[in-house]
Amino acid sequence: MLSGRPQEHQISSELRRRRAGILAVMFAFGVIYATWATRTPAIRDELGVSIAQMGILMMGLSAGSMVGVLSSAKLISKFGTRRIIAVGVTVSVCALALIGIFTTFESSPGVAIGLALVGLGMGISDVALNIEGAEIEHLTRRSLLPALHGFFSVGTVIGALAGIGFSAINLAPVYHLCLAAAILGPLATWGYLGIPRGFGIVDKGAVAGAAAATPAEAAAPDGPVQSDSAPDTSAPAKQRSVLLDPTILLIGVIILAMGFAEGSADDWLPLLIVDSQGASEMAGSLVYTGFAASMALGRLAGGAFVQRFGHAQVLAVSAVMAVFGVLGVIYAPNVAVAMAAVLFWGVGSSLGFPVAISTAGNTSDRPIARVSAVTTWGYAAFLVGPPLLGFMGEHIGLGNALLLVAALLVLAAVAATVLTRRLRSQLPLPEGP
């Protein structure tokens, strides 16, 4: 059975530390991502590569993330969330420094390997962090996932501000990235040490991690745990049934589009501003900081809106806001207008991942399998997005390539409207802000 659930008399103090721990780790991942994103113009120039080639390099990050996500369920079921998060964040922190070192040696393959390792660490940790967040929501009956992803965005703001400063003084990326890694290492260690041991582990003979029940269900006398003599041979079929569930398909379309919107800004926004507006690297970092700040604001305030209006309704409105933001940045006549438009892009994209995951996880019907499934949909966008936009940008311009993002967001708004009808009387919302 799943182990590691805190006892009732310990729950308040343990949950506070546990919550702080996963927030700290998510913050560290945000700083890592922004540290890379804000220095992409400088890294591109040092490597001497084109937009299409940058897209291929970024595919390393996405491919690593996808491998991490796809392998996370089995790894979590064997080792537990704490160990997976510890390994994942350690790999990502070390790989950030490697990216800077390989940039100095003008090694594009080395940078691609570093990005793949960053993505791998983020991918395996992200699923584990979301499972931790969903479990804390289950225990406290309070919304947490928007705030959890909000701390990622807070990390991107801090990382982006540092990127602005270091870009302004023309600090070489290697020094910037290695300094960030040295600072984030102790913070991440403190974070994962607050996560209880053993949570997420499935004993031999239980349902595989991706098809496991919540801890409460697994502990129940009539829970899904099976004996060693009767292994669950239907687990693959159950996983396929989750992936083909109409509700999961709708959520998958939404998180795919929202992931595309978020990932395209993370990967291409500084370069878009530098190339399309003829702006400096510092200006590109400043616009990206505006995006990151609006993402953080949307996620930190989003729980109240989800509580009031419901998951699917918030997703629909968010998609529409993101459409206007993306189009505004594409057709902005100057950097100031792009900065204003990017705020809509950021707020609109901010709740896509956390609210979609929360929608999938707030169910008694195999929530871990559902969270894993929709997370895979989201990371598919990060896998396909960078090289696709890079290839399109090389031929039709990066701004025109981003019209694909706007089109996907329109599709997400339609899917969220359909999802609203399906969930109106089915999904209980967490209590409290």
Predicted segments, located by residue:
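Symmetry-related core transmembrane helices of the 12-TM Major Facilitator Superfamily/SLC fold
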Residues: 174-193, 402-418
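C-terminal transmembrane helical hairpin of 12-TM major facilitator-type secondary transporters
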Residues: 309-356
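Short amphipathic helix-loop junctions that connect adjacent transmembrane helices
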Residues: 38-52, 267-283
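Intracellular juxtamembrane helix-capping segments at the cytosolic ends
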Residues: 123-139, 350-365
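C-terminal ends and interior cores of transmembrane alpha-helices
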Residues: 90-105, 321-333
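Helix-to-loop junctions at the C-terminal end of transmembrane segments
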Residues: 68-81, 167, 298-311, 393-394
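Hydrophobic core of transmembrane alpha-helices in multi-pass small-molecule transporters
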Residues: 27, 106-125, 337-350
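Primarily marks hydrophobic transmembrane alpha-helices of the MFS/SLC 12-helix fold
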Residues: 82-85, 315-316
